Amino acid sequence: MEESILYIKNGTIIDPKENRPYKADLQIENGRISRIIRKEGEHFKISADALALAEGKDSLSAVRQDNAALAEGKVIDAQGLMIAPGLADTHVHFRDPGFTYKEDIYTGAAAAAKGGFTQIVLMANTKPCVDNEDTLSYVLAKGKETGIHIASCVNVTKGMAGKELTDMERLSERGAAGFTDDGIPLLNEELVREAMERAKKLHKPISFHEENPAFIVNNGINRGRASAFYHIGGSPGEAETDLVKRDLELALLTGADVVIQHISTKEAVELVRRAKEKGASVHAEATPHHFTLTEEAAIEKGTLAKMNPPLREEADRLAIIKGLKDGTIDLIATDHAPHSREEKDRPVTEAPSGIIGLETALSLGIRELVEKGHLTWPELIERMSTSPCRLYGLEGGRVEEKAAADLVLFHPQERWTVSEFTSKSSNSPFIGESLPGVVYYTICGGRIVYKKA
């Protein structure tokens, strides 16, 4: 829906710069927040003059048209709803090009909008992978056809082979948001160092999938109770910490903006904490599944709870929450990884790793982090919107006058049951669960791109 002026009244705004949410009304004009009116004291009502200005009519006529304006969607009554900056996810797989039977950019964007996301950063492990200008141009052009903002990382190495760096400078000029070979760990230390140095010069983040295959017998299942249950070797925490330790040292050496992707172990969290204390420009992602579940889910849910890195022990889950709480981990990212039902129905050692997450992320953040007292509302939104946008230089993550009107309106207590998905895929361990947090509207650039039916 395209409207030059949109009013949102009676909402509760979550602004990460504020200590607590506050009641206010918003006015949106031409894709930006033009006015915020705090409700301090007397209840604010959208004035007849304001509506008259919007409609080009006299005040009396505007008063008579108020109900009609509401019905047409020009005024949103957000009573009971929270208004936050549109969520931003910097670790997403839309499988396009190459694997569009799992997801494509259009269906992925629709799933993102339903989950409250207005900004997505795609990973580059498609087919062909995003190591060249043509594939990058394809992804960005298709992204512009959706209702949300879609950026994309490009590969660090050609063909994701870990041997030769891509033309990082040229790809940066063509619109790359950052660099990653996510899905494949980079084992050549000298190559990683050079990549960091070049990324720093380009002022772009470089992200790393930290699992050393030398330690791993079977991906996706933790070496512990879960691997014992399946009688397999599994994947130990050392696989992660080995590469995290190396890359944090290189981050200190090069000064690059380094992102440790989908952190899963208490040891890695502590390593990141120490590196930050030393002054490294390092960032870490936590996925909702890693701060919610443990390896017990892999035993109970099977391949629906198989992902890389795997779900770990309760001590690891609690360490991730502590890291989110004290700022060691500054990004919540879904690692949305769609797979077909046929693929996930394979035996645990053969099924691909990964779960979808865009439509459940906000609810899990509410239940696991806010309702349990680990994060305040502003802190949750900081990690799900403001911090990701800041790191990648994206517009968004703010609710203030003149800011882009990228917003999510949701009811924090209303519950919903995880069942059908907008995504093409349904590989989620949360199916059947009742979760808090229902998205009513997602607004991107002043346009309503999702509205609860």
Q: What are these regions, as identified by a protein language model?
A:
Residues 11, 31, 80, 91, ...:
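Divalent metal-coordination and catalytic microenvironments
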Residues 78-143:
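Metal-associated gating/positioning segment near the N- to mid-region
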Residues 1-52, 56-62, 66:
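N-terminal metal-binding scaffold of metallo-dependent hydrolase/deaminase domains
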Residues 163-332:
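Histidine/acidic residue-rich metal-binding segments in metalloenzymes
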Residues 229-257, 304, 325-326, 330-332, ...:
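His/Asp/Glu-enriched, well-ordered alpha-helical/loop segment
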Residues 102-109, 160-170:
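Short, acidic/polar
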Residues 347-350, 404-453:
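C-terminal cap of metal-dependent C-N hydrolases
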Residues 142-156:
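A glycine-rich helix N-cap at a beta->alpha junction
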